[in-house]
């Protein structure tokens, strides 16, 4: 029998050369794919990298600018009012709400369960991209309707049923990028709500077609305010980027919350 060449390495051994705690086999493979594509990968699901956990959060204690309370005998008030100048401001028991996640990215069961949970916690939830699920609206005591770049599923009559309008500009997981819903998640029901063919990838643009700058955005905020007859707060949702500059510009557009 011919002798095996000990110096010859198989493909699997070659692919893992140079790996370490940072450059794992998955990371190296991802780099190879991106170099072949010439762009970032388009895929579903969450980020591959590790992100901070709830246990990593630290609440800033009170000193001079915030009056200190005696935690063992005084109650810390968490109630939050959004849009106090509106006819129907949103009143939360906690300063946290369930952010926008679309029907499609999440299942019907997940959306309705989050709606029930938000109501139990005295908080709010949001429609996300793609329009309204009637049962989500029914189970949500406080509910935001989202105005998004693609306009998929946007219905002004549904917006008038909301407790607040959220204008989507960015989100933490992918700041400055549009949406991408994998084809296997575009079921017949999702496709019908968004007026799209089922089973194909759905892309949303990174920019809104209704404005090019802060002046246009201010007009959009006013348009939504007139749509809802100034009954509910108009909220701008930003992904954290140039926070100081972005928040200053957003504030000039006169929303009820950012």
Which residues fall in each region the model found?
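Conserved, well-structured core domains of diverse proteins
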Residues: 1-96, 100, 105-119, 123-124, ...
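Alpha/beta enzyme core
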Residues: 116, 152-258
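General beta-strand structural signal in soluble alpha/beta enzymes
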Residues: 125-128, 145, 167, 236
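Charge-rich, low-complexity amphipathic helices
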Residues: 136-141, 246-250
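Active-site loop/lid in soluble adenylation, ligation, and acyl-transfer enzymes
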Residues: 145-153
């Amino acid at each position: 029998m011919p002798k095996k060449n000990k110096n010859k390495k198989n493909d699997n051994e070659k692919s893992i050369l140079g790996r370490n705690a940072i450059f794992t086999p998955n990371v190296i493979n991802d780099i190879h794919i991106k170099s072949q594509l010439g762009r970032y990968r388009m895929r579903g699901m969450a980020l591959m990298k590790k992100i901070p956990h709830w246990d990593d959060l630290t609440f800033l204690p009170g000193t001079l600018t915030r009056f200190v309370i005696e935690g063992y005998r005084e109650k810390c008030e968490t109630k939050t009012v959004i849009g106090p100048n509106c006819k129907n401001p949103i009143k939360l028991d906690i300063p946290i709400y369930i952010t926008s996640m679309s029907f499609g990215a999440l299942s019907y069961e997940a959306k309705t369960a989050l709606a029930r949970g938000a109501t139990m916690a005295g908080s709010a939830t949001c429609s996300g991209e793609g329009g309204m699920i009637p049962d989500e609206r029914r189970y949500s005591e406080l509910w935001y309707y989202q105005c998004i770049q693609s306009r998929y599923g946007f219905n002004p009559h549904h917006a008038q049923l909301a407790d607040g309008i959220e204008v989507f500009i960015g989100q933490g997981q992918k700041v400055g990028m549009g949406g991408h819903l994998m084809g296997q998640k575009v079921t017949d029901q999702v496709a019908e709500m968004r007026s799209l063919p089922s089973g194909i990838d759905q892309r949303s643009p990174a920019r809104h077609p209704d404005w090019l700058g802060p002046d246009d955005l201010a007009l959009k905020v006013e348009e939504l305010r007139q749509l809802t007859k100034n009954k509910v707060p108009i909220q701008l949702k930003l992904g954290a980027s140039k926070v100081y500059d972005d928040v200053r510009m957003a504030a000039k557009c006169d929303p009820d919350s950012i």
